[in-house]
Amino acid sequence: IRYDRPYRKCARIVGDTMGKYHPHGDSSIYDALVVMAQDFKKGRTLVDGHGNFGSIEGDGAAAMRYTEARLEKLTQDVFLSDLDKNVVDFVPNFDETEKEPSVLPVRIPNILVNGADGIAVGMATSIPPHNLGEVIDAVKAYMKDNTISVKGLMRYIKGPDFPTGGIVVNKDDLHKIYETGSGKIRLRGKVEVEKLKGGRKQLVITEIPYTMLGANIGKFLNDVASLIETKKTTDIVDISNQSSKEGIRIVLELKKDTDVENLTNMLYKKTRLEDTFGVNMLAVADGRPETLSLKQIIEYHVDFVFEITTRKYHTLLDKELEKQEVQEGLIKACDVIDLIIEILRGSKNREQVRKCLVEGITEGIKFKSKASEKAAAKLLFTERQANAILDMRLYKL
């Protein structure tokens, strides 16, 4: 399911995942896949979905037998690169028939970029998403100066960046939230005023609080309709939801001479056009759940990237040293090529040759002379060098 290969049926992906790694039912796997493909829920989608993957109004995705998916390029490059270079440990899967990475060698703090939410026994986490560029800039700033404060990091990360947009009302509280890892963010929808013919106006909502996602959009429309029916406002003539794949567009057509500011404030007060997002930056750190500050999350991430980068280059170095060892052995073999061919001709099997090349044991090998046998006993190639010589075709030798 690489990004540069054709889409694959989601039913196949879910089946493979359940059979190899997650024997706990297909619905939870498919739900997770769908969320990772929804750009209105994730700041950066990790799955490239093809087909009906639901809508911002809360419509569900089509059944997995109809939809297709593959990885986004970002996922391939940032989450899965260098897995073949021993950057993380591999552990057996649930039935010990496969190996799987204990963690993915992700090169960005995805917990900040895409946020996280979930519940467990006695604990819950709720981390808002942030702008990828801002997060990377903050990580770079920490790497230059690891004594930087949360306030210093906030010069780069201005605040949450929700995929649905919205305006943070209590910006002054963000420092405390990022310092302690918990708090509440007050969000407002973005309202624009458009002028119509005849001096009339309409309010257009182009961004909504993240908490208004899904069925809550319909609830907002019902709440506005209820305000009209109960005559708590007489300024709204019509309401329509014109949202599409291009984005949110909820239109409130107004009477002439409506006090737009008063009406907007009433909508903030009486509906979910203003709402709170609870923050609890709980994560598993060193095997234990811990509420982390913004700086701690970045610190853990940088330490992790340092670890996987160190492991990567240790692996590459080991491979180059092995290659060097083999090349040195082949160079040495070139100098005694006639003797090696004599050993090959005089031996009965591969093991005899190996013992002669590595340990200097000449027993059972027929030599042309005692001098040759004496020289063969002093070759002393390494095990790796001997195998390289034995694996090489004679014409190459």
Located regions from the model:
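Long, charged, helix-rich clamp/arm modules that form nucleic acid-engaging surfaces
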Residues: I1, C10, T17-Y21, D161, ...
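Catalytic phosphate-handling regions of large nucleic-acid enzymes and associated NTPases
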Residues: I1-G181, R249-V251
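Flexible hinge/switch segments at interdomain interfaces of large molecular machines
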Residues: Y7-K9, R44-H50, N114, G183-V204, ...
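Short amphipathic alpha-helical segments
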Residues: I29, T67, N131, M212-N216, ...
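Structured core elements
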Residues: Y30, V34-M36, L46, G54-S55, ...
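Alpha-helical scaffold elements adjacent to nucleotide-binding pockets in ATP/GTP-utilizing enzyme cores
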Residues: A32-M36, Y66-L74, E134-V139, K219-D223, ...
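Long amphipathic alpha-helical segments
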Residues: K73-T75, F79, L83, K219, ...
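Long hydrophobic segments that form regular secondary structure
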Residues: E192-I239
